[in-house]
Amino acid sequence: MSAIKLRAYQQRVIDQLASYLDNDSIHIVAPPGSGKTILGMTLVEKIQRKTLILVPSILLKKQWIEVIQHYYPQWEISEELLQPANITVTTYQYLYSKRKELDNHFTEHGIGFLVLDESHHLKKNWSDLLLDLKEKATELQTLALTATPPFDANQKEWGNYIRLTGAIDEEITVSELINEAVLAPYQDYVYLAPVTKESQKQFTEFLNEQNQIVSHLCSQPEVTDYLLAQEFIHQPLNQTEFIYQNFDSYLSCLLYLNEQQYQFSDDHWQVLGIKRNKIKIPQQTRKSIIDLYQYLFQVVPQLEIFRYLSKKGWLYEDKLRLFPDFEINNQANIPLMKEAIEHIVVKEESYLGNELRCVLLFDYIKQEVLAGKEDYLEYGVAPAFLSLKELIRPETSLAVVCGEFLIVSQKIFQTHFQTYAEFRREKKLAGYIYLAMTDKNRSELLALTTQLLDSSEINLLIGTVSLLDEGWNCPAVNTIIMGNAAGSYVQTQQIRGRGLRCSGDEKLTNIWHIASIYPNIPVTEQPLFAAILKRLSFIEGLNLMDEPVISTGRERFELPDILDLRTIAGYTQNNLYRAKERKQHFMLWETALKQGTHLAMPLFIRSRPKETEVHLESNAFKLDNVDQLNLIQAFLQGALNIYFKERKRKKHWHKACQVRQKLVQTLYQLLLNEGVLSESIPLVIDWNNHSFSCEIVASYHQEKLFNELICELLGEIHSPRYLLKIKQDYFVIPGRYSKNKKAVLIFLTAIKQQGLTADFFYTKNISGRKQLIKARLNSLQASDTLDINERKIWQ
């Protein structure tokens, strides 16, 4: 019998993992405060193999050893990697330092279970070493524990991470822990700070220059002449093998030539496998321009156009950089960012008074401003201190902490820091004392400062992200202001986690994100904010658009469609007002939590017009209201064209949803047949005039697998092994069911059992490539595009 008594949510995870205990890898996501160490030890006990536990810090190493000694005092523990015991605990850094001595270390010492604590750190070069060691120890089993999987890592980093940790098997959600009163509820707010007119001008000039370059690329006589001389253009039937193997390049050439008034010969239509009058050739897109010039740069880099691109910075060090990102001059916007922080602090101070326990975090210290350097365009810990100490009320206690120094008020110094007087340094900081931090006193000074914040003797603490990292904990924090740069999803979650510990009844933490906004630019095209919003969309929280719901997704931030100066100011002002309503938001969390028991992961499929489509609107009504428009109203308002167009769209959408429903049911039935799902796991499908949704209620691993298969089946068509055709529509046969023809036939049989008539095509031969081309062309000429999004909803 285990010596550890688990909480309900921990027991749920252990129960769900029972069927995975023999897998090569187990991967658990759990927020700070959920007891990842306890979960890890429970699994170590169940696995019963010689174990190596790797952690990213000495602090966590000590924590693991203390937990083991408390619950299992009889277990033999080693801290020496090269002299392992039944349980060995060490750091990733130490493992890496001994890499030359570890060639067959796991096999030679019989290590069978590897625990990777805080596994999100494995984006670093440690992962390459561990992957190599894991491949040599074929019997090795891994357990990855993390609060913050690197969801926004690039494709290569994420691939390496998953190769080592395996796919996520189970997740303990923040909402579960709030429901169990282990963590405190919170509310995320975005403060929109419009950039300066100078920055707006720079961005406008960037967009204008980009448009000029694109216009230049879309019509180049030398490019036209070169393409017309190629055999795959003037004799395509002789070059079908080249065309089918390089279809993206071929298609981009055709789209380009079409805009030069080139008339496609019958041979091209034969290669494309469609009749001339059955398709309207689409315009060039960003992707087609990239495909075209990447192809040309490979075969004729001497073209004059590439000298032009080099001058414009779109070709650098022999690499094309088409559509480069806007190089942001953050310095010009520093005064507005500082003003935003000051505004938030003053408001939160007025709302909470002495109950304020706020942490303001930056990336940089900028200590030189304490010595008198002009701070107007400096952004960091020290400049924020100098401005805020003049703004806050006399009774608000302010402190600053970073790796180099601590600043506290004279009153706090006299009552709590007299024993550290030897570290005092003379600085002209009226009313405040500067203490130098050293390796000798750092941990003590930080611990005492944290204690004073926890007890409200300090109300506002300014610090660096690097010092107040994932090991820092102060339960009393009720306001977090993220003054740092956008950072990664991992860093964002770690910072947010500083404010989620419970510290009494009805605590709710306000978490502020500051975003520089370019007025009149769509949200998705914002140079700075788009990346921040993407990270925030992964985070669950209260969605107050209608009734209170806990969900992920950008919708919960209720951002305005039009980001002009007026709406930017109104949005921010509304957030500042709502930040006052802590008690109301606490009750809304309670209401939302009562509506469910777990965080489900439904998929939502929506059709949206492509960006190039022109939206027709009349003064009488907009398309948003077309559901309420009947035939007589349409006639009276002169909108019959839109009425019939919308009616046709809805009819087509409902037919498509009926097919989707049967395809989803097919996948569900196949997973039942394989034993991946059980009959007790329900499938829920729903749709309306604008969206289609589906979900199963199962373990994280099962839900994720199901969603991935649906996305593969219904998503965008790239280069699948097998294609599925139902009437005129094409779908991808998921890789799980397209390893060979036998697997495909099983998939096809399951589809026919749902009452659908379907054909399949192997895309690696000529006839299959033709079908793939048709599928891609259908997608290109479609007026709408499908968005498939996974959201998490408490239900």
Predicted stretch roles:
Residues 124-183:
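Post-DEXD/H (motif II) to motif III coupling segment of the RecA-like Helicase ATP-binding lobe
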Residues 462, 467-485, 509-513:
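A short beta-strand element within the Helicase C-terminal
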Residues 498-529:
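Conserved segment of the helicase C-terminal RecA-like domain
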Residues 216-267, 528-743, 750-760, 764:
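Long, largely alpha-helical accessory region at the distal end of helicase-like NTP-driven motors
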Residues 31-34, 38, 55, 62, ...:
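Conserved C-terminal RecA-like helicase domain
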Residues 81-110, 124, 128, 467:
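Conserved helix/coil segment N-terminal to the catalytic DExD/H
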Residues 1-29:
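Conserved pre-motif I regulatory segment
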